[in-house]
A protein has these predicted regions:
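Soluble non-cytosolic domains of exported or imported proteins
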Residues: 20-28, 109-113, 220
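A cross-kingdom marker for long, charged
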Residues: 12, 199-266
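Flexible, glycine-rich surface segments
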Residues: 135-222
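Acidic/His-rich structured neighborhood in mature extracellular/periplasmic domains
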Residues: 67-167
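Start-of-domain marker
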Residues: 5-72, 81-84
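Sec-exported extracytoplasmic/periplasmic mature domains
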Residues: 34, 38-42, 120, 124-128, ...
Length: 266
């Protein structure tokens, strides 16, 4: 366990596409990336998030230009619940045993900055559960970092990351749904339950989903969120007798249709 925002990090390195000789370069990178996430304090203001992530890195090729070794890769990051990021177009220079060092200033380091970007995205989404739009400053850090990446000598993949962070930040409906769902859960877990807070939060949740459906239609990030929490959401809505919201979810989230139907029958 480290002393940063992440308390559990599982790194899985896939080197099947590399030659046996090239694989020797990466003896320590798995552990180095894990320790980087565990021991980096990405922001001293939010040091109690206790996040866990899985990080699957596929090394696609190793090329040599002059004295540099250049790595091309793709990756999947997930918090094993509602956050899932697929990263393609990862490119960075690397030398055997290279240490990954965090610098708070906005100097682009192709490998560290790539890791920082996803740290910022996980932190932003987590903060959105604690405070309304609480993750905005971290979404902005991810966007600013992507801007730097796009304008750097290592621009591959950064335009996609720039678009992704802007898209998620601008989806105020999902961000509000997430906040209000967790607000309702917190209120239910209090020593003295104020049912008005719970009902108000889930009423806003309904309005947000309704507006999101009208303005955006099927949204990948929203469906990931519902995939993770649909059972708990349905149980809560049923207890509150909010059948309209269950019916809305039934139409929006087809993959979990049977769950919503079962709670509507109760």
């Amino acid at each position: 366990m480290g002393w940063g925002q992440f308390i559990e990090v599982n790194v899985d390195l896939d080197m099947r596409r590399l030659s046996e000789g090239d694989r020797q370069l990466f003896n320590s990178i798995e552990e180095d990336m894990k320790q980087y996430y565990l021991n980096t304090l990405f922001s001293p203001e939010v040091d109690d998030l206790k996040m866990s992530i899985d990080f699957h890195l596929v090394l696609e090729s190793v090329s040599r230009g002059g004295s540099q070794i250049i790595i091309n890769a793709q990756a999947i990051f997930t918090n094993k619940r509602d956050q899932y990021f697929y990263a393609k177009g990862i490119q960075f220079p690397y030398s055997q045993g290279q240490k990954i060092i965090y610098t708070p200033s906005f100097d682009l380091d192709p490998l560290a900055s790539f890791l920082n970007y996803y740290a910022f995205m996980f932190i932003a989404t987590n903060l959105d559960t604690w405070e309304y739009m609480g993750g905005t400053s971290f979404f902005n850090r991810a966007i600013e970092l992507s801007d730097l990446g796009k304008d750097s000598d290592w621009s591959v993949g950064w335009d996609d990351r720039w678009k992704k962070s802007r898209k998620i930040k601008s989806n105020q409906y999902l961000r509000s749904m997430r906040f209000n769902y967790f607000t309702a859960l917190d209120a239910l877990g209090a020593e003295e339950v104020d049912i008005t807070i719970v009902k108000n939060a889930m009423s806003i949740f309904h309005e947000d989903l309704l507006t999101l459906d009208k303005k955006m239609g099927s949204n990948k990030e929203t469906l990931h969120f519902l995939k993770a929490y649909h059972e708990s959401i349905a149980e809560l809505l049923s207890a509150l007798n909010l059948k309209d919201t269950l019916e809305l979810l039934l139409l929006y989230d087809h993959d979990n249709k049977k769950v919503y139907e079962s709670y509507l029958k109760n």
